[in-house]
């Protein structure tokens, strides 16, 4: 699973995810991509589940690019613990994904296989998604 090797701060504040993604909105490596239509935290387990779903459907043919990384820790306190007494222990790792971000890319397989693999991966994620295709000239993604 994806986890950072080393972090500067073990516990981080949640913050807000407002607006659209600034970068990473186009398909750059493969021919097809999976774009987020909502903003959400995506855990390392969800990223791994989506990756496994894609590679199994493609029967290990082609190539998958994961363009998000779970860099923030999230914390939670125990079940029977009262309020106060500091922040809870780190539970896992999440990748903040804003709307418009291309999270996964696929290349080296036919269009039907790529679309179905990305559709299966989208079902593993907590955001609404759409499949975008790389444009030949401008490199911009469009919905097909």
From Swiss-Prot:
Q: Which residues are connected by disulfide bridges in this protein?
A: none
Q: Which GO terms describe its molecular function?
A: rRNA binding; structural constituent of ribosome; tRNA binding
Region entry Disordered: which residue ranges? 1-20
Regions of biased composition (Basic residues) lie at: 1-16
Kindly state which keywords UniProt assigns to this record, in alphabetical order.
Answer: Ribonucleoprotein, Ribosomal protein, RNA-binding, rRNA-binding, tRNA-binding
What GO biological process, any one, is recorded here? translation
Tell me which InterPro entries the record gives.
Answer: Ribosomal_uL16, Ribosomal_uL16_bact-type, Ribosomal_uL16_CS, Ribosomal_uL16_dom, Ribosomal_uL16_sf
Tell me yes or no: is Plastid among this UniProt entry's keywords: no
Gene Ontology CC terms? cytosolic large ribosomal subunit
User: Which PROSITE patterns does the protein's record reference?
Assistant: RIBOSOMAL_L16_1 (PS00586), RIBOSOMAL_L16_2 (PS00701)
Alphabetized NCBIfam families for the sequence: rplP_bact
Function as written in the Swiss-Prot or TrEMBL entry:
Binds 23S rRNA and is also seen to make contacts with the A and possibly P site tRNAs.
Assembly mode: Part of the 50S ribosomal subunit.
Q: What protein name does the entry list?
A: Large ribosomal subunit protein uL16
Which species expresses this protein natively?
Limosilactobacillus reuteri (strain DSM 20016)
């Amino acid at each position: 699973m994806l986890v950072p090797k080393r972090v500067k701060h073990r516990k981080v504040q949640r913050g807000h995810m407002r607006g659209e993604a600034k970068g990473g909105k186009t398909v750059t490596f493969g021919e097809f991509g999976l774009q987020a239509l909502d903003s959400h935290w995506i855990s390392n387990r969800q990223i791994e589940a989506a990756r496994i779903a894609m590679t199994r459907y493609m029967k290990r043919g082609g190539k998958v690019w994961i363009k998000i990384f779970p860099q923030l820790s999230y914390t939670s306190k125990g079940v029977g613990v009262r309020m106060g007494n500091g922040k809870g222990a780190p539970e896992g790792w999440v990748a903040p994904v804003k709307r418009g971000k291309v999270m996964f890319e696929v290349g080296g397989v036919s269009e039907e296989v790529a679309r179905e693999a990305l559709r299966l991966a989208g079902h593993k994620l907590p955001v609404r998604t759409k499949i975008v295709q790389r444009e030949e000239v401008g490199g911009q993604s469009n919905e097909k």
